[in-house]
Regions:
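Multi-pass alpha-helical membrane architecture of UbiA-family
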Residues: 1-203
Length: 203
């Protein structure tokens, strides 16, 4: 929900409240697609690691039902995104972000390039909003999205780091290890804060 909230706030700089809600809803549907497809792809590993917090592992939903749900929500995300203020150009960028996130789920999470989809997907979000409004996002906003998203990547893997290593899911944080990942995350977050502060001081 954090991504959706940020989307709404950022959209309000360019669009009305109702239009911003429309855009945020399109992004929310995209987030569902990414999260559910990740659960589907990771199911064998999640089951082996006994992650009962996952619906598929807990058997609260079947794989076939989840596949159908992903298809329906993906189509809904496309239609709503196209008919929202994002239009064709913003939707194209939105779906570039979804494609990047899917590439992470499918393959890149297990490579040294694991942070790249975070850079692409979250860096694309402000572009989708601003391009749809007929302008381009300030550099500091894009940079902030990239820095904070990258920091999140290094922190987000920590809870499953040991089981990831056991299952040979060797993304960049897993290769670097827990301590280095925490340090890098703190550095990136610090740079993100500095970016926001300096940009607003100049304003």
């Amino acid at each position: 929900m954090l991504v959706v909230t940020i989307t709404y706030v950022l959209s309000r700089t360019q669009f009305s409240a109702s239009d911003s809600l429309f855009i945020a809803f399109a992004i929310l549907l995209g987030q569902f697609v990414v999260g559910w497809s990740n659960d589907l792809i990771d199911f064998p590993r999640d089951r082996a690691a006994k992650r009962l917090g996952k619906p598929l592992v807990a058997a609260t939903i079947t794989q076939s039902t989840l596949k159908i749900s992903i298809g329906i929500v993906l189509l809904s995300a496309l239609i709503i995104s196209l008919f929202s203020p994002l239009g064709v150009s913003g939707t194209a960028i939105h779906f570039l972000g979804l494609l990047s996130a899917t590439a992470y789920n499918l393959k890149l999470k297990s490579t040294l390039l694991s942070v790249v989809p975070y850079i692409v997907s979250f860096g694309a979000l402000p572009w989708a909003i601003y391009v749809a409004a007929g302008t381009k996002p300030p550099t500091w906003i894009v940079l902030g999205f990239v820095l904070f998203a990258s920091a999140f990547h290094f922190l987000n893997v920590l809870k499953d780091l040991d089981s990831d290593v056991d299952q040979d899911v060797m993304g960049l944080p897993q290769v670097l290890g827990r301590q280095k990942s925490i340090l890098i995350a703190l550095l990136l977050a610090g740079l993100g804060i500095l970016d926001v502060v300096l940009a607003n001081i100049r304003v």
